[in-house]
């Protein structure tokens, strides 16, 4: 596990201030106040010198997409391997970000279009994304929300946050609230406590999730006081954002342990990034280190169509190759779900290798990770569903609502639909002529 010695830490702190100490280094507020935001500071901190052309190109990118790196995260950069270093690529601005493709978008997931009130994205029936803070400890170069991160105009007021909470209160189908940003854990303990208290008091909200990269880039933020705030509101889940095994350091592991020991389940959402983790063996090592740190791999995201990140995108086939190399080759719950977050707001679409080879009238032909092909004989007397939920003998506890959407209508026994037809289909329209 990566670990900085006290001597190395002092070397870095002295680059920032002659009077700085290890206690300063371990103070998240000191880390934030000394974030690296320009090329000169980066050169001084790392002890490197860019040539003038490269320095100018980096600065041009910063002028369009601001840079901010915590000293802690910058200390993980391998200065002997800058061109290939995964920490450097994720954190330092690049002229490649200025190459804009015509298919790239500021809001590729149409989060703003699915926003009924400021701060809320309501895409799925029973859950919402609650955008509570535009600020991040570090500005990831592959960020899908570059349009909002660090923008003061994107910072919701307390009144706007209250209106968003009221929206959740007034929609009793919402059972799951995801706090997002920016990074929710950069809010003050007191303000975060208030938000969590308000949401947890809503009877129909069953759980709260928090998406945060703080354990990765600013583990010092996971203080005892913050943990005491969070654990008051179980069930609360936290999804981290580790992209490479070198990010799991001693300091980061300590932060994860604090969260896990307080009873908070941890998941991880990785973005597939060209030149960073687009390798089956890097991804396997990452997920195995996560599991040993009590973090379950949750999603592997295909890189979005946001502006300025085309150099990070891989082919979808690369993602499938990685999943193929994980299934069967490592622990089952060390395999994330590979998804494409559909442009235009279609939501997360799982993409998986195909393990069904063929079907017969009474059997399914399957293959395993080794290439072994096998036959599974299906039951001959399976009766399916009576399609009458009022007389069903399945032990379904409590009230529930049948609200089928999309392919679910065609594949379940409850609905009699035989096809899904897009709106304005010309052939169907001719039937009415």
UniProtKB/Swiss-Prot annotation:
Amino acids binding Zn(2+): 279, 389, 392, 396
Transmembrane segments annotated in the record for this chain: none
Modified residues (N6-(pyridoxal phosphate)lysine): 348
Catalysed transformations (reactions): L-lysine = (3S)-3,6-diaminohexanoate
PROSITE patterns per the UniProt record, alphabetical: RADICAL_SAM (PS51918)
Keywords: 4Fe-4S, Iron, Iron-sulfur, Isomerase, Metal-binding, Pyridoxal phosphate, S-adenosyl-L-methionine, Zinc
Observed effect of gene inactivation: Cells lacking both ablA and ablB no longer produce N6-acetyl-beta-lysine and are incapable of growth at high salt concentrations.
Residues annotated as domain Radical SAM core: 122-334
Cofactor note: Binds 1 [4Fe-4S] cluster. The cluster is coordinated with 3 cysteines and an exchangeable S-adenosyl-L-methionine.
UniProt cross-references to CDD domains, sorted A to Z: Radical_SAM (cd01335)
A GO term for molecular function: metal ion binding
EC number: 5.4.3.2
Role of this protein: Catalyzes the interconversion of L-alpha-lysine and L-beta-lysine. Is involved in the biosynthesis pathway of N6-acetyl-beta-lysine, a compatible solute produced by methanogenic archaea that helps cells to cope with salt stress.
Similarity annotation: Belongs to the radical SAM superfamily. KamA family.
Name of this protein: L-lysine 2,3-aminomutase
Source organism: Methanococcus maripaludis (strain DSM 14266 / JCM 13030 / NBRC 101832 / S2 / LL)
Phylogenetic lineage: Archaea, Methanobacteriati, Methanobacteriota, Methanomada group, Methanococci
């Amino acid at each position: 596990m990566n670990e900085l010695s006290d001597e190395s830490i002092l070397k870095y702190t002295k680059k920032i201030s002659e009077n700085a100490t290890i206690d300063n280094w371990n103070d998240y507020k000191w880390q934030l106040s000394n974030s690296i935001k320009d090329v000169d500071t980066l050169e001084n901190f790392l002890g490197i010198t860019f040539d003038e052309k490269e320095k100018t190109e980096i600065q041009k990118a910063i002028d369009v997409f601001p840079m901010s790196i915590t000293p802690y995260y910058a200390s993980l950069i391998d200065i002997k391997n800058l061109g290939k270093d995964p920490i450097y690529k994720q954190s330092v601005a690049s002229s490649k970000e200025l190459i804009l493709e015509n298919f790239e978008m500021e809001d590729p997931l149409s989060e703003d279009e699915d926003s009924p009130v400021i701060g809320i994205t309501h895409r799925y029936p029973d859950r919402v994304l609650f955008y509570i803070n535009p600020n991040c400890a570090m500005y990831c170069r592959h960020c899908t929300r570059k349009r909002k991160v660090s923008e003061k105009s994107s910072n919701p007021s307390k009144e706007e946050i209250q209106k968003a909470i009221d929206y959740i209160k007034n929609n009793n189908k919402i059972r799951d609230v995801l706090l997002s940003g920016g990074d929710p854990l950069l809010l003050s303990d007191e303000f975060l406590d208030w938000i969590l208290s308000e949401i947890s008091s809503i009877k129909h909200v069953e759980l709260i999730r928090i998406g945060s990269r703080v354990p990765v880039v600013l583990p010092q933020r996971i203080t005892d006081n913050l943990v005491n705030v969070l654990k008051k509101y179980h069930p609360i889940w936290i999804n981290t954002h580790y992209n490479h095994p070198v990010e799991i350091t001693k300091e980061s592991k300590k932060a994860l342990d604090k969260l896990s020991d307080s009873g908070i389940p941890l998941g991880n959402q990785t973005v597939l990034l060209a030149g960073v983790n687009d390798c089956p063996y890097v991804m396997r090592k990452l997920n195995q280190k996560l599991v040993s740190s009590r973090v379950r791999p949750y999603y592997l995201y295909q890189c979005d169509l946001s502006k300025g990140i085309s150099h990070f995108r891989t082919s979808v086939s690369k993602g499938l190759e990685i999943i193929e190399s994980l299934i069967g080759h490592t622990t089952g719950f060390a395999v994330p779900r590979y998804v494409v977050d559909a442009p235009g707001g279609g939501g997360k679409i799982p993409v998986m290798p195909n393990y069904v080879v063929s079907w017969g009238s009474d059997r399914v032909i399957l293959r395993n990770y080794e290439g072994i092909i096998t036959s599974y004989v299906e039951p001959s007397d399976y009766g399916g569903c009576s399609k009458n939920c009022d007389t069903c003998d399945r032990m379904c506890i409590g009230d529930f609502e049948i609200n089928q959407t999309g392919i679910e209508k065609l594949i379940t026994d409850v609905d009699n639909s035989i096809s899904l037809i897009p709106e304005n289909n010309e052939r169907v329209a001719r039937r009415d002529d």
